[in-house]
């Protein structure tokens, strides 16, 4: 792929006028306290853009707002060439709000002692609550705009709302008003289950769904056809099954991803079959997994989550060859 992402063909994002890259960057780990310094994140974001990615998905709570700040810092002068999607609906626990301004001091200490995210007690992380009230949504969107250094979001999404909240539609009026004010261009729902996704489709103003789809998790695929009929874009996340489709077989404990031992056993057999399929084709399992989701009819953007340059390099070298990225965009554009 060339050095200018404008050379990369795009897909239409549902019935909107947004044109997006087939792969987007999930920014949940951008700015994390357990990772590198901010300049490295900026370089990572800029490099992903140079390699053809123009869709960036973040949220107000990701890295206590640092994810949005780094996106704003990186793309302030290239705002019209990217698609910014953010989310809101969660409330940061007091512990995390307190730690946020201390990140520059804590990051080198954490790196020195080798502390990982998994080693942090829940009492320090705190429990996330939710708020989808008009006041909170407006305050959150305006906060995101400040951090992203922009006057509008291309896409705003409710962040994992319960089905009852989606069903109520109490949030629609607020988001429609913010569309009229020019603060958001489109809005959608990031869903945790199929039921929420199907309910979201009943609201005519919804322009997108974000759902989990992978070789190992296909339940939400039932939303693809009705979304396509309505012209609703679909953003696929967790396409590598939270790492299960990139880790070595010896490193994967499927029980961590499943509700029961029986489900874990079934997915274990599926995983073995997919490993063999990738081997037979002479490609990595990660590439097989990404191709599967990318080529699903109705998927507009396939999110990949990276937080280090070596991860991005490996992804493009092994799993997203340039010719595949361009060819898949061309196929979608023709459909």
Give the location of each predicted region.
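Alpha-helix-centered segments that form part of catalytic cores
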Residues: 2, 116-143, 147, 282
